[in-house]
């Protein structure tokens, strides 16, 4: 389970150190990285990534939008080995798409981690905090209530 925030910097070789508290969730020293829906990078343990990949594969290839979605998702995905110092090397195209050049904010999202350019995340967080009450009210209306 991934929770909380932390900020790390890319080193001179473009590597980033995973937060200590999260390293154990990545079995076999493997992490899967892909582009997120909001201009960020998402990191998944192998089991969570495989579940998501299976959902994508269930989409019919007879639909052009499904093919394009699968094409983007799988072409932007990378299997990355975690080195002995807990670092990963993200691809330059993935870093460029997310606008990450130095400071990286790690955001725990329960099943995965989002990576954001820190300045971009700070702007997003400020807006989200301002709208938190409205966001929660609208989202929680969709959740069935236990009685």
Residue ranges of each PLM-predicted region?
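Flexible "stalk/tail and boundary" regions
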Residues: 1-8, 12-13, 22-80, 84, ...
